[in-house]
Amino acid sequence: MEAIMKDTYISEAVKYIGADDTTLDLFESQYQIPNGVSYNSYVILDEKVAVMDTIDERKTDANLENVLNGRTVDYLVISHLEPDHAANIKRAADKFPQAQLVLSAKAKAMLPQFFDIAHLEERCLVVKEGDTLELGTHKLHYVMAPMVHWPEVMV
């Protein structure tokens, strides 16, 4: 995969750490994508650090280290378990063992089918419709959106 990191800062505190993959010609083995695909992941740097989804492991480490600048991750937010969003959850969870995994109840139930993460039960922070996670000045408000794409989707 030739994935290209874009050094994109959305704001001083919100950084894009995704990558473009121009070598993929079919998304989910079904949809033609002649220009490739973007894997989207973001970091919010506040009193607490949150990583929103993960991308392909060949790019996650470099992209994440680039913006963390020595800080550690407090929260790994898992919007859903589709591989282009979640492929690197285990690697990130292992690298940041203190990080809580923020996810829906459905995603928590599904997660062990995809990944073997140490101390999973105590690391999960299950959020539901209307919950808020305070990072400092930034607050994440959760909306459950099951079957918008996958059964456990939250935004």
Question: For each predicted feature, which ranges?
Answer:
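Short coil/turn connectors at secondary-structure junctions
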Residues: E47-K48, V73, P97-Q98, L120-E122, ...
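Short catalytic-loop micro-motif centered on adjacent basic/acidic residues
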Residues: A50-D53, D74-I78, Y142
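Conserved beta-strand hairpin/beta-sheet module of binuclear metal-dependent hydrolase folds
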Residues: D7-N66, V155
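Flexible, active-site-proximal loop/turn residues at the rims of small-molecule/cofactor binding pockets
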Residues: D21, E82, A107
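Metallo-beta-lactamase
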Residues: I4-E12, L103-M154
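Active-site metal-binding motif and surrounding structural segment of the metallo-beta-lactamase
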Residues: E57-V102
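Short glycine-/acidic-enriched loop or helix-start segments at secondary-structure transitions
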Residues: L26-F27, D61, N88-I89, P112-Q113, ...
